[in-house]
Amino acid sequence: MRQTTFVKHQEVKQKWFVIDAESKILGRLAAFVASRLRGKHYPHFTPNVDMGDKIIIINAEKILLTAKKEEQKLYYNHSGYPGGLRVRTAREMRAKKPIALLERAIYGMIPHTKLGDKQRKNLYVYSGSEHPHLGQNPEKLEVK
């Protein structure tokens, strides 16, 4: 009789990868990274274990938005006070904090649970081409 095997968190070995976001489309890159952060690319994927990889994204300010999304895509924030709604376009978000576009897209694709919080901590986004994680010897990963 065969039994389904489940991976325990002690058995998980996380790898480090670096992705260059220059001239990559925002949604496609975010979906790819979210899948990698969850570990869904492994054949032994277990949904209740943090088995995803650690992902470093560089050149986040050079990400592409298709069509007219630079002016038409809106991001909403509310302070919690009456009249505290702030609406920004993607262009304004990119000017103020370039990594926020990418982080927000990826975070929206990861479950909003305690496990999702752990998986989100495995993402490191930098606006330039330099990052401080050279000691981990990250492998270069190409987005399909």
From Swiss-Prot:
Cellular component aspect of the GO annotation: cytosolic large ribosomal subunit
GO MF terms, alphabetically ordered: mRNA binding; structural constituent of ribosome
Intrachain disulfide bonds: none
UniProt keywords, alphabetically: Ribonucleoprotein, Ribosomal protein
Biological process, per Gene Ontology: negative regulation of translation; translation
Subunit relationships: Part of the 50S ribosomal subunit.
Described purpose of this protein according to its UniProt entry: This protein is one of the early assembly proteins of the 50S ribosomal subunit, although it is not seen to bind rRNA by itself. It is important during the early stages of 50S assembly.
PANTHER family: LARGE RIBOSOMAL SUBUNIT PROTEIN UL13M, RIBOSOMAL PROTEIN L13
UniProt-listed NCBIfam families: rplM_bact
Family: Belongs to the universal ribosomal protein uL13 family.
Protein name: Large ribosomal subunit protein uL13
Taxonomic source organism: Mesomycoplasma hyopneumoniae (strain 7448) (Mycoplasma hyopneumoniae)
